[in-house]
Amino acid sequence: MKKNGRDNNFYHLYKNKYLITGVTILSFILMFQYKYHEVLTLHDNSENAVQSSKLFWARLLFGRTRSRITGQILKMEIPNTYRLFIFNFLIKYMHINKEEIKYPIESYKSIGDFFSRYIREETRPIGDVSDYSIVSPCDSELIDYGELTSEYLENIKGVKFNVNTFLGSKFQKKHNDGSTKFFYAIFYLSPKKYHHFHAPFNFKYKIRRHISGELFPVFQGMFKFINNLFNINERVILSGEWKGGNVYYAAISAYNVGNIKIINDEELVTNNLRHQLSYMGGDINTKIFDSYKSVEVGDEIGEFRMGSSIVVIFENKKDFSWNVNQNQTVSVGQRLGGIGEPVKEENRFIKIRS
């Protein structure tokens, strides 16, 4: 009888093995979730601690390791015989303008190389070279823009995030005589777009901050799900000045976009799994260059390996005005706003690195 009892116990255990496995996995997940909440609370991050459950489950779905794996897959070299077929399929499926691509598509060795392709400079003229004007830094959707009136920026869904936290430093004016205001513009680059980003006006920068973070998607639904999405995601900020005053130029990582490159900044390494995330207490990597790095309007600044977001926060004269609409599709070099009538130069196009 005892033997039969033991056999029955083993039978019931075997019968319920999936339930036991599920309960065990769920227990580990809940334990990790509790520890994650403790970390956010320990670092006095009350805003993130309140939404720690959302952040935890978003991490499970969109972990940084997944983006690294995707990145490695996209780097895999495609045999010459298959390149035309694969790239022509992507061009047709994603509605990419083939005529704008600078180099023959068969010259791209991998899907990652194709997504970071260059376009022909003459297809992107500079729409305004006058002082105090701004042009689009990228091919993108202009999802939000306006005047920045406090340290909180309200995005298109009505959710606010702290600009100082986003920049990793306190933003401040260069001119304190009441003649200027701060303005901002947020751009979303979809995967099919040209992935390099350029200078929206003539400016110079001396400080680069790398703020390690998550790689959550930046589509509109995520803004509502996570209040301060841009303060959570990994980003690189260039701080400098231009004709109108101070400027902050930010490139933000997103899901499958773990790689941000800035021209002539070989020390910058993004999506490094050894870095403790800044919003969880990790340090902000700040590089101060020996001298200012100057860029002219339309000059290439860097690139993503897939689509993501650019945020430009800039000081300018009070009479600056926009001439675009929210959610408008814009091309790099296209005029977004200025003072007075635009000034164009013949044969003035964007510049890519040689």
UniProtKB/Swiss-Prot annotation:
The listed outcome for residue 308 to A/T is: Prevents processing of the proenzyme
Q: Where is this site: Cleavage (non-hydrolytic)?
A: 307-308
Please tell me one Gene Ontology term that the record gives under cellular component.
Answer: mitochondrion
Quote the subcellular location field of this record.
Membrane; Endoplasmic reticulum membrane
Posttranslational mods: Is synthesized initially as an inactive proenzyme. Formation of the active enzyme involves a self-maturation process in which the active site pyruvoyl group is generated from an internal serine residue via an autocatalytic post-translational modification. Two non-identical subunits are generated from the proenzyme in this reaction, and the pyruvate is formed at the N-terminus of the alpha chain, which is derived from the carboxyl end of the proenzyme.
The record's listing under InterPro entries reads: PS_Dcarbxylase, PSD-B, PSD_type1_euk
Q: Give EC number(s), comma-separated.
A: 4.1.1.65
Keyword annotations of the record = Decarboxylase, Endoplasmic reticulum, Lipid biosynthesis, Lipid metabolism, Lyase, Membrane, Phospholipid biosynthesis, Phospholipid metabolism, Pyruvate, Transmembrane, Transmembrane helix, Zymogen
The Swiss-Prot or TrEMBL record describes its family as follows: Belongs to the phosphatidylserine decarboxylase family. PSD-B subfamily. Eukaryotic type I sub-subfamily.
Instruction: Please explain the role this protein plays, according to its UniProt record.
Output: Catalyzes the formation of phosphatidylethanolamine (PtdEtn) from phosphatidylserine (PtdSer). Plays a central role in phospholipid metabolism and in the interorganelle trafficking of phosphatidylserine.
Name used for this protein in its record: Phosphatidylserine decarboxylase proenzyme
The record lists the organism as Plasmodium knowlesi (strain H)
